[in-house]
Curated annotation (Swiss-Prot):
Protein name as annotated: Hemoglobin subunit alpha-A
Family the UniProt entry places it in: Belongs to the globin family.
Taxon lineage: Eukaryota, Metazoa, Chordata, Craniata, Vertebrata
Gene: HBAA
Gene Ontology molecular-function annotations: haptoglobin binding; heme binding; iron ion binding; organic acid binding; oxygen binding; oxygen carrier activity; peroxidase activity
The species this protein was found in: Chroicocephalus ridibundus (Black-headed gull)
Role according to the record: Involved in oxygen transport from the lung to the various peripheral tissues.
């Protein structure tokens, strides 16, 4: 459960990310594919090279979902309901991949905004990303 300070911290991070969300989304995916090559299996039709238009486009979707969740932090489940249905019923993505993506997003934020990612903010952002992952996997059951 996200506390009031967690919510403030998450909104602060997304405020700092600002117009870079799409770029960070693509960078997160590239990092995930490089670090966890097994995640590539869900994208057999993608050009997974650095700077690929397909990775950028999907990164934009990832970023949009995270921004949507942050903007509706009191109702993440409602904000991501359709995306949860898609991943559970059609795409059938292994739930562990959401954790891997979250870890990679934390690294990207740390690279670009090291001073923002204090231990408290890091913990809040991690809790938020876990909450997003839980919402996206809730309909698997």
């Amino acid at each position: 459960v996200l506390s009031g300070s967690d919510k403030t911290n998450v909104k602060g991070v997304f405020g700092k990310i600002g117009g870079h969300a799409e770029e960070y989304g693509a960078e997160t995916l590239e990092r995930m594919f490089a670090t966890y090559p097994q995640t590539k299996t869900y994208f057999p039709h993608f050009d997974l090279q650095h700077g690929s238009a397909q990775v950028k486009a999907h990164g934009k979707k990832v970023a949009a979902a995270l921004v949507e969740a942050a903007n509706h932090i009191d109702d993440i489940a409602g904000a991501l309901s359709k995306l949860s249905d898609l991943h559970a019923q059609k795409l059938r993505v292994d739930p562990v991949n959401f954790k891997l993506l979250g870890q990679c997003f934390l690294v990207v934020v740390a690279i670009h905004h090291p001073s923002v990612l204090t231990p408290e903010v890091h913990a809040s952002l991690d809790k938020f990303l876990c909450a997003v992952g839980n919402v996206l996997t809730a309909k698997y059951r």
